[in-house]
Amino acid sequence: KKILALVAILAIGLGSVNAQESLRWGVTAGMNSSKYSNDFLNSRTGFHVGVKAEMALPQVAEGVYLEFGGLLTSKGAKFNYGSLVNLKLNPYYLEIPVHMGYKYVINENFAVFGNAGPYAAIGVFGKIKAKADLSSAGGNIDWEEWGIDPSDLKGEGSENIFGKDKMKRFDLGLGIKTGVEFNQKYQVAISYDWGLLETIDDSDWKNRNLMISFSYMF
């Protein structure tokens, strides 16, 4: 509820200044492929959704603009070792990117753009999920002959991903984006974010996130 309220407030705030010719706002959503900066975990598929705004800066140069907004975005990674171990890290962040960009208008119905800049994010919720089945690790071993109940070699569980001695809530990073715009309303873009902060103390786990976005500008 808090997340929806923040997104709604941002949308209302942007809408209240939409009368200014230099600013327009829109909605955006898409798919993520996220991982961490180490080689231990694999990427996972997620999503993002939110609002965005573009403010033209003709006083700087024609085509230059500032892009900012608010996104609810999933990040994290996963690890699978056959059927033995399955681990998923599913953190969700409220992210605020602020990018400087340039848009080249080819004609009134088509333009290409690119932008880059920092983002700040706060972790809002998420789970660590783990599942293990070590009963098949011994091949044809009859565990009962060894006095081991095979069910004792299986287990699963989950817990909150953020908190003390867990993942840090705050993240800061850099992002780059490129895309195309149709009819001055529809945008398709691809972007990549590099987290600059360790998500866990004394680790090399920094967020990495590839996003494909679809936006509608009002």
Could you say what each language-model-derived stretch is?
Residues 27-31, 49-55, 70-72, 96-102, ...:
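Residues on the lipid-exposed face of transmembrane beta-strands in outer-membrane beta-barrel proteins
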Residues 71, 75-78, 91, 151-154, ...:
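Predominantly the C-terminal beta-signal and adjacent terminal strand-loop region
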Residues 24-26, 32-35, 40-94:
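Glycine- and aromatic-enriched membrane insertion/assembly motifs of diderm outer-membrane
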Residues 59-64, 110, 184-190:
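Repeated loop/turn-to-beta-strand initiation elements of outer-membrane beta-barrel proteins
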Residues 14-19:
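Sec/Tat signal peptide C-region and signal peptidase I cleavage site
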Residues 35-43, 75-92, 123-171, 203:
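Extracellular/periplasm-exposed beta-strand and loop segments of Gram-negative cell-envelope proteins
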Residues 3-12:
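Sec-dependent N-terminal signal peptides
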Residues 21-23, 43-47, 90-96, 110, ...:
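Residues that define the transmembrane beta-barrel architecture of outer-membrane proteins
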